[in-house]
From Swiss-Prot:
Activated by phosphorylation. Binds 1 Mg(2+) ion per subunit. Its cofactor is Mg(2+). PANTHER family: PHOSPHOGLUCOMUTASE (ALPHA-D-GLUCOSE-1,6-BISPHOSPHATE-DEPENDENT) (PTHR42946:SF1), PHOSPHOHEXOSE MUTASE (PTHR42946). SUPFAM superfamilies: Phosphoglucomutase, C-terminal domain, Phosphoglucomutase, first 3 domains. GO terms for cellular component: cytosol. GO terms for biological process: carbohydrate metabolic process; peptidoglycan biosynthetic process; UDP-N-acetylglucosamine biosynthetic process. The lineage of its organism: Bacteria, Pseudomonadati, Pseudomonadota, Alphaproteobacteria, Hyphomicrobiales. PROSITE patterns: PGM_PMM. It comes from Bartonella tribocorum (strain CIP 105476 / IBS 506). This is Phosphoglucosamine mutase. Transmembrane segments: none annotated. Signal peptide: none annotated. Mg(2+) binds at S102, D243, D245, D247.
């Protein structure tokens, strides 16, 4: 299903440029309000946001649209995305809205939507919303007496903190654990340091002073350099890197080595399997997860199920098949025993619990497998249909044959950025380099603009 406005993670774009404009955000609010008012009784909406400057603008526009449609809005302020999903259920809301562009720079923003169960809306629901956005809704709005209200809710960030803390086993405390947490100047800047401190850790928070324009700026899960320096400086046991909206996490061990999402999934899956907590004898990841993870899990008698890229597709597969551990190499870790979406803080707490239980340093705990050589490249393009051109399709077919059955090639258009993402992995590094370089040349040659990154 090709969608007009929604990508793999909601609606996203540059702030004050279509579709992230106040008038379009108001249309989204109206469309969502009209749809949910007709299907639910409470007419209650919760809205959270990260720390981007444009969040205020889009928040007000959404409120205008939602209240015009007769919805009552509860404004949570800056909270992590998983907090919106959790509070949507806790506050018995019909709808949850998160204003965020996740790990993107401050000048981008986006709108993510959650249903009353705390799960992101399905493709079908998003398609219905798109139809309503393009419809004249003037006759479908609330009457003067039924216009909705809006109010700010204080203290709900502490409900999320308590929720996150409860995911840690009751017999586990973090006393004497030295932790550096990089909050990415984002939505988790209050919740993450506070939760870790309340659990007994010695906490060194960095990038916890958002100003509207410094979110994800040389910090967080997309840039670990300052976190690694701080871990080394204070001799920390572990560094935790969150992204702008707090739904993904990467770890830095005491040696300042990076631990990606695949390794974190391996740690949790192995630990939960030993404890009898791992359901369905396996995990769900995406086509981008390293082949080394699959080999590691298979060696433990566990399965690995792959989905399209995007944590929503991981969650969908987990729900359909009953798995309780899933995620992406980028750090989206979904643990359905606790929540309905990726949660960086909760995932980090599970890793810390594994560290305390094993009594091993993070470097020993988290290097569970040797990653298969993998090359990731982005090609900035103007026309995403370039992959449908026959010369490009032919080149991809030839590349797959050259790599053989023991390697993998993934080429896809990004759902959030104007780029083609190429991933090749296999045991022969030189072959991977050659194949990827040749494919990049073919793609750029057949696109109307050439710009590789």
């Amino acid at each position: 299903m090709v969608q007009k406005y929604f990508g793999t993670d909601g609606i996203r774009g540059k702030a004050n440029s279509f579709p992230m404009t106040p008038d379009f955000a108001m249309k989204v609010g109206m469309a969502v309000g009209v749809l949910f008012r007709s299907q639910h009784q409470s007419r209650r909406v919760v809205i959270g946001k990260d720390t981007r400057l444009s969040g205020y603008m889009l928040e007000n526009a959404l409120v205008s649209g939602l209240t015009a449609a007769g919805m009552d809005v509860f404004l949570l302020g800056p909270v992590p995305t998983p907090a919106v999903a959790m509070l949507c259920r806790s506050l018995r809301a019909d709808l949850g809205v998160m204003i965020s562009a996740s790990h993107n720079p401050f000048y981008d923003n986006g709108i993510k939507l959650f249903g009353p169960d705390g799960f992101k809306l399905s493709d079908d629901m998003e398609a219905k919303i798109e139809q309503l956005i393009d419809t004249d809704l003037s006759k479908s709005l609330a009457s003067s007496a039924e216009i909705g209200s809006a109010k700010r809710v204080e203290g709900d960030i502490y409900r999320y903190i308590e929720y996150a803390k409860r995911t840690l086993p009751r017999d586990v405390r973090l006393d004497a654990v030295r932790i550096v947490v990089d909050c990415a100047n984002g939505a988790a800047y209050k919740a993450a340091p506070r939760a870790l401190w309340e659990l007994g850790a010695e906490v060194f928070a960095i990038h916890d002073e958002p100003n509207g324009t410094n979110i994800n700026q040389k910090c967080g899960s997309t840039d670990l350099s300052s976190l690694k320096r701080k871990v080394h400086e204070v001799r920390a046991d572990v560094g935790i890197a969150l992204d702008g909206d707090g739904d993904r996490v990467l770890i830095v061990d005491e040696k300042a080595q990076t631990v990606d999402g695949d390794q974190l999934i391996a740690v949790i899956a192995e630990n939960w399997h030993k404890m009898g907590r791992l359901r369905c004898n396996g995990v769900v990841t995406t086509i981008m997860s390293n082949l080394g993870l699959e080999r590691f899990l298979n060696g433990k008698g566990l399965d690995l199920i792959r989905t399209k890229v995007g944590d929503r597709y991981v969650v969908d597969a987990m729900r359909q098949k009953g798995y309780n551990v899933g995620g992406e190499a980028s750090g989206h870790i979904v643990l359905s025993d606790f929540g309905t979406t990726g949660d960086g803080l909760v995932a980090a707490l599970q890793i810390l619990a594994c560290m305390k239980e094993s009594q091993n340093p993070m470097s020993q705990l988290c290097q569970r497998f040797e990653p298969v050589p993998q090359i990731l490249k982005n090609v900035t393009i103007k026309n995403k249909n370039v992959l449908k051109k026959n010369p490009v399709k032919t080149a991809i077919d030839q590349a797959e044959k050259r790599l053989g059955k023991e390697a993998r090639l993934v080429i896809r258009a990004s759902g959030t950025e104007p780029v083609i993402r190429l991933m090749a992995e296999g045991d022969a590094r030189e072959v991977l380099d050659t194949v990827v370089t040749e494919l990049m040349d073919v793609i750029t040659h057949h696109d109307t603009r050439v710009d590789c990154i």
